[in-house]
Amino acid sequence: MAGLIRVTPEELRAMAKQYGVESQEVLNQVDRLNRMISDLKSMWEGASSEAFADQYEQLKPSFIKMSDLLQDVNQQLDQTANTLESTDQDIANQIRG
């Protein structure tokens, strides 16, 4: 049995836009962290500094993947909104004959 759809295409698009904004915010945060690491490396030298920077570099791909996933959700919600809108119109056209 199908569930009840309680969302409009406009609401889905608005939510998609929010996911897109959050995706960009993650990338902005990565840029800020890159600058902070660079600044820190100019003040802190040695093995511990290198270990800290290496640890960040190992984590950075996860941040990028998070941004990519948020962008994927953005696109999926947009596609769902388009499908919902199109399907509703198709049903209306069938009813009209």
Curated annotation (Swiss-Prot):
<keyword id="KW-0175">Coiled coil</keyword>
<comment type="function">
    <text>Required to deliver LXG toxins to target cells.</text>
</comment>
<dbReference type="InterPro" id="IPR010310">
    <property type="entry name" value="T7SS_ESAT-6-like"/>
</dbReference>
<comment type="subunit">
    <text>Homodimer.</text>
</comment>
<keyword id="KW-0964">Secreted</keyword>
<protein>
    <recommendedName>
        <fullName>Protein YukE</fullName>
    </recommendedName>
</protein>
<dbReference type="InterPro" id="IPR036689">
    <property type="entry name" value="ESAT-6-like_sf"/>
</dbReference>
<feature type="coiled-coil region">
    <location>
        <begin position="21"/>
        <end position="94"/>
    </location>
</feature>
<dbReference type="Pfam" id="PF06013">
    <property type="entry name" value="WXG100"/>
</dbReference>
<comment type="similarity">
    <text>Belongs to the WXG100 family. sagEsxA-like subfamily.</text>
</comment>
<dbReference type="GO" id="GO:0005576">
    <property type="term" value="C:extracellular region"/>
</dbReference>
